[in-house]
């Protein structure tokens, strides 16, 4: 029967022609961290002969025996390798020839089926048919792991790079399109295996490990009104023994094996795998080494010179058995990254940007304030719109939480203005870390942490810089939450012990800001909220769908890095809990904040207006006018935002010309419905969700998704080491309360203020762990793909979108030039500040490494 069908397909022998193609593949071991050294020898693929077959699928000639699906060509097999490519990774790609039988009736191939009869998987990059008669070149972008066929329940199929809306799909390809989506959705059951490609949702019930005792129990996030959360990728691991509602965890040594759909572990030597390996090494090997190093010695820095030795001299690690185990366990390629050593076991860190030019400028009030506009967390500051500041916490539960700052505290610093005049002139701003922290502060302070909730008021000076006016530090009333808070207000001083107290007050604010930054600005508002978009896009939008092609680069590695984070970073006892002041309450606290998350407000212009730092203004270039003109994050960000929106507008307008076309796109409607009702299901009834009924709603939504995944993440991630790599500037923990007069701590503060400061903030061991973490998080991989770039230049066949994408890239290049110009303008004092650190976090491109610039396409580290 099969012989008759293929004979009918290709006709007599005289009619058949040959179509030659090129297949690009990558060997499994190239990307295997456990055998990195061995893999670099680059063995030739053992895939020749009849071990890998390809069958083209016609988009114009049907197969009557196969339910109106396109006919298959005869199988074709890989021929001898043509050449070896050497990309930036340590491995290599190999190109093979493949020759297909073809005839006129077969027409244009729209897809192909691949079968792997080999024992190992391989990474398939692409298939290119160079000269299909009467059509020319046909290119298939694959970028997928192909396992032995026995591992799959259905054929592996890949489509040509011609996008189609569902209604425009060639009839003979529709069933293939639909079946591929069914495969990717799975049926919601079973434990996922390494070769699976299934995308599904789950709640965050895998952060704790109740089988290891009560101290390792963590609140389930998601699925409840009390602790709502974005969904994560489902792994299907069995429940824990002691709590059937908690998912079991995999052992630390298997951290690289945590499930994500196989193609979310891309075919490149990616930073997220490096991060996972590095974090595992820190937890498993470096921490015991550091404990051994500090055992029997005080876990304190005695002076700022002590701290500087981390960067200028290094710390000699003991040459004990654990150190030998460390060097034996980590591939040689990574030793220099984890331990910058000259072979003598010296733990040394690069000098962070914040102390590169001056060792003391970070302590100035101007720099303290400037980093709220141009530091690593420039997304919190807001305009003060009522005085004194009022709390939004429920007074029934928390009593009076309103601020105790009075006009007397600040009016002598307002350049002759009253408080009302300063507010009316848009001169007063606030960094408000009160309401988010107070509900947890009583519990947080039962740990080694001794922290406050803080409010910081600032004044916008005529030169465009901000001046701190007052810091209010509050902690829960000792008699109970219903009695409100105990607060004290501190004001700037540069004389005597009051100056030291003011420096400590700023440090308590920085501790708050670091914790809010890591858990909310960074983890929640980029990593966590984007994962449901990754899952829904793969489940509901075919790879043929134009919107899949638009968004796909902005999801690269996100599920992988988030899975690694659940395993090593944000889990019970993980690195983040060990470094931030919220400790074991950190993730639960982020769930409470998620209650206020609003998707349309993630658009940069909307965010700036909501925080009161901008007002809507149709005459301004981006539709908003900044009230702080020299606001580097906002100025550069609005340029990037507008470039993204122009690109998305051009792209979407090519495919959708009317509301009707949006409404009849069944894949698009299913995608948006699933995002609302499942991916962000705890917020499905919110009135602010776009209805997805117009091209403009699609444009706005896609622009916001791309902004979150690219520029917003870059702004809050890659400045971590430049600003927080020097822990005194951004301490993660406070261990003592503010010294009171008459106490030994107060006398120490008068006698040795630097030592008292260092005894208050992050301890020595935590500092080393924290600096190690932010250094890893702040690095770019050498094969990073930045905004305005694509992995494959042939990602679509449509010429108009390709031209629009080219315009997008050129616009980003222009923005780079503008950023350089602004950074060179001495009038814009907030661009570099007292520390002389030019603002480059939204500079679109970068080299690999620790650069403090570059906008990767996706949340990939």
UniProtKB/Swiss-Prot annotation:
Q: Its catalytic activity?
A: (9Z,12Z)-octadecadienoate + O2 = (9S)-hydroperoxy-(10E,12Z)-octadecadienoate
Please share the entry's free-text remark on the cofactor: Binds 1 Fe cation per subunit. Iron is tightly bound.
Annotated spans, Disordered: 220-246
* Keyword tags: Cytoplasm, Dioxygenase, Fatty acid biosynthesis, Fatty acid metabolism, Iron, Lipid biosynthesis, Lipid metabolism, Metal-binding, Oxidoreductase, Oxylipin biosynthesis
The record places domain Lipoxygenase at 163-861
A single Gene Ontology biological process assigned to it is: fatty acid biosynthetic process
Annotated binding of Fe cation, by residue: 522, 527, 713, 717, 861
EC top class, in one word?
oxidoreductase
Indicate where this protein resides in the cell.
Answer: Cytoplasm
Pathway connected to this protein = Lipid metabolism; oxylipin biosynthesis
Q: Which CDD domains match?
A: PLAT_LH2
Q: Tell me which residues make up the PLAT domain.
A: 29-160
Q: Please give the positions of the paired cysteines in each disulfide bond.
A: none
Query: What GO terms are given for molecular function?
Result: linoleate 9S-lipoxygenase activity; metal ion binding; oxidoreductase activity, acting on single donors with incorporation of molecular oxygen, incorporation of two atoms of oxygen
Which coenzyme or cofactor does it need?
A: Fe cation
Under which EC number(s) is this enzyme classified?
A: 1.13.11.58
Q: Which Pfam families match?
A: Lipoxygenase (PF00305), PLAT (PF01477)
Primary site of residence = cytoplasm
One GO CC term, this protein? cytoplasm
Protein family according to the UniProt entry: Belongs to the lipoxygenase family.
**What function is annotated for this protein?**
Plant lipoxygenases may be involved in a number of diverse aspects of plant physiology including growth and development, pest resistance, and senescence or responses to wounding. Catalyzes the hydroperoxidation of lipids containing a cis,cis-1,4-pentadiene structure.
What is annotated about its quaternary structure and interactions? Monomer.
| Protein name, as recorded | Linoleate 9S-lipoxygenase 1
Gene (name only): LOX1.1
